[in-house]
């Protein structure tokens, strides 16, 4: 068993990648600037982080930043991707893991989704960006680093009901404690 692990560990995880493709190895970090520590701010940041997360090959429990040290699925993929026999195809179909590429992760779209989520929570001046960080040992592998700047949220300054008839006005006054919108809350 030790011999097979050593043989597999000598296999390249990038040898069957298409020309110009880069293997995604996870998120290096998500840097948050001007973080809002309020409950709505934490909820917004949780959704933003979920939108940016994408597990790489051999992710540990679906984590986008922690990986198992042995990419067994990629090794099997590279060893059996071009096999024609029944056994080779069976092993490939059961054990292989298709490489997750930077283009598959699509970080451009992910930062746009994250920015839209910030807008939904009232952070209209929020900004998101990403950077591809190449692996120093293998330029065909890279991690992503995201930057999220929350800035101050827009809040509700005043709430007015206009052109309300007398009866409706008294109903509104009677149920004022049940309102959904309150002055000072995030524009959400």
Where are these regions (language model features)?
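Sec-dependent signal peptide recognition
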Residues: 1-2
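C-terminal motif of bacterial Sec signal peptides marking the signal peptidase cleavage site
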Residues: 7-10
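Interaction-mediating elements
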Residues: 12-188
């Amino acid at each position: 068993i030790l011999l097979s692990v050593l043989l597999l560990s000598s296999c390249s995880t990038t040898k069957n990648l298409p020309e110009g493709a880069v293997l995604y190895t996870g998120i290096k970090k998500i840097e948050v600037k001007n973080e809002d520590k309020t409950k709505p701010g934490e909820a917004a940041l949780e959704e933003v982080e979920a939108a940016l997360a994408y597990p790489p090959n051999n992710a540990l429990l679906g984590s986008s930043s922690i990986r198992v040290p042995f990419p067994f699925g990629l090794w099997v993929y590279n060893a059996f991707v071009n096999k024609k026999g029944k056994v080779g195809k069976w092993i490939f179909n059961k054990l292989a893991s298709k490489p997750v590429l930077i283009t598959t992760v699509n970080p451009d779209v992910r930062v746009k989704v994250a920015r839209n989520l910030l807008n939904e929570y009232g952070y209209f001046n929020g900004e998101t960006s990403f950077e591809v960080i190449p692996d120093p040992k293998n330029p065909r592998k890279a991690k992503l680093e995201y930057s999220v700047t929350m800035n101050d949220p827009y809040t509700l300054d005043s709430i007015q009901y206009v052109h309300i008839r007398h009866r409706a006005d008294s109903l509104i006054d009677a149920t004022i404690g049940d309102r959904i919108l309150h002055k000072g809350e995030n524009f959400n």
